[in-house]
Amino acid sequence: MSGTLALTEQLIARASVTPDDQHCQRLLIERLAALGFEHETIESNGVTNLWAVKRGVDGTAGKLLAFAGHTDVVPTGPLEQWRSAPFEPTHRDGKLYGRGAADMKASIAGFVVASEEFVAAHPAHRGTIAFLITSDEEGPATDGTVKVVEALQERGERMDYCIVGEPTSSAQFGDMVKNGRRGSMSGKLIVKGVQGHIAYPHLAKNPVHLLAPALAELVAERWDDGNEYFPPTTWQVSNIHSGTGATNVIPGHADVMFNFRFSTASTVEGLQARVHAILDKHGLEYDLQWTVSGLPFLTPRGDLSNALAKAIKDETGLNTELSTTGGTSDGRFIARICKQVIEFGPLNASIHKIDEHIEVAHIEPLKNVYRRVLEQLIA
């Protein structure tokens, strides 16, 4: 059994359902400390975060490459639907099954073993290796990576490169990396009306009828055209609720929850202003609360993307694709202190599902890609 596979299994065996780390990070610290990493644990509201650093011979003047990831996993769902226990690593048909196998304990194991091999081969490496690991990526993400980034900002520390181990591969291992992510902003809209008997509409004010034209305009609006890296911004309704459940009562208010996934072609302020302008144009009386869960970030082609593309090509023979599709990730926080943030990891087809798994044959190549990037950028 390879060292990467063994460590992956050790991590899967720890039932680290968010935000409980289940001492996964303690296991990582033992391995990293043996390599000479300095480390600190940053705890916040039940969340465990790890920042570990091994300086190269160039000291603080050298380039810093960070590996970022999360030890927490999503809940298992109904246990009876799993073919094998989710926290008992199980091999079947060339696959390793277990919650977190693909998202993202294999990536973390790959980070660690790649660093071990790199340090053994390059004991006098010039640049710095760092690890940023959290147990709050699958949850609210309010006490995890963002807290470490804030602490680093206060100390004036920065990263030059960061690889986030998210499972980005789509159809084949290595076929896709993420060099950016769209921003996410949600709105909770309450349109006010006047409740009344449905037989006497002249004595009431139906908020659903008032809302409908504005809603149609919001749905039809083209928010931007996207750009070279991002598709156009999207606006989607997630929930609509109104009424008491009775068939003879005009409701007093209508509630709508919606979400923007927006590119670097738009801004938070600009999108909010346009929504308010449409609602105001239709003469609505309303309350609107906004929640921005992440700003868009983008890493243009550069040293990190080139090194990762070459590493993937050398390891798999594939020409990888740069993409910004998908949901948000902790890369949105890291981008505040790092100009080059790229996500790369295993196939994502089974993540968050019953019987999550990773192809055993992909585990060593994953580690090798990470090691090849270290060799190119900080040896």
Curated annotation (Swiss-Prot):
It comes from Paraburkholderia phytofirmans (strain DSM 17436 / LMG 22146 / PsJN). Keywords: Amino-acid biosynthesis, Cobalt, Diaminopimelate biosynthesis, Hydrolase, Lysine biosynthesis, Metal-binding, Zinc. The keyword Plastid does not apply. The keyword Amino-acid biosynthesis applies. It holds the Pfam family Peptidase_M20. Pathway: Amino-acid biosynthesis; L-lysine biosynthesis via DAP pathway; LL-2,6-diaminopimelate from (S)-tetrahydrodipicolinate (succinylase route): step 3/3. InterPro entries: ArgE/DapE_CS, Bact_exopeptidase_dim_dom, DapE_proteobac, Peptidase_M20, Peptidase_M20_dimer, Peptidase_M20A. GO terms for molecular function: acetylornithine deacetylase activity; cobalt ion binding; succinyl-diaminopimelate desuccinylase activity; zinc ion binding. SUPFAM superfamilies: Bacterial exopeptidase dimerisation domain, Zn-dependent exopeptidases. This is Succinyl-diaminopimelate desuccinylase. Catalyzes the hydrolysis of N-succinyl-L,L-diaminopimelic acid (SDAP), forming succinate and LL-2,6-diaminopimelate (DAP), an intermediate involved in the bacterial biosynthesis of lysine and meso-diaminopimelic acid, an essential component of bacterial cell walls. Homodimer. Zn(2+) 1 binds at H70, D103, E166. The lineage of its organism: Bacteria, Pseudomonadati, Pseudomonadota, Betaproteobacteria, Burkholderiales. Its EC number is 3.5.1.18. Zn(2+) 2 binds at D103, E138, H352. It catalyses: N-succinyl-(2S,6S)-2,6-diaminopimelate + H2O = (2S,6S)-2,6-diaminopimelate + succinate. Binds 2 Zn(2+) or Co(2+) ions per subunit. The gene is dapE. GO terms for biological process: diaminopimelate biosynthetic process; L-arginine biosynthetic process; lysine biosynthetic process via diaminopimelate. Its cofactor is Zn(2+); Co(2+). The active site is at D72, E137 (proton acceptor). Belongs to the peptidase M20A family. DapE subfamily.
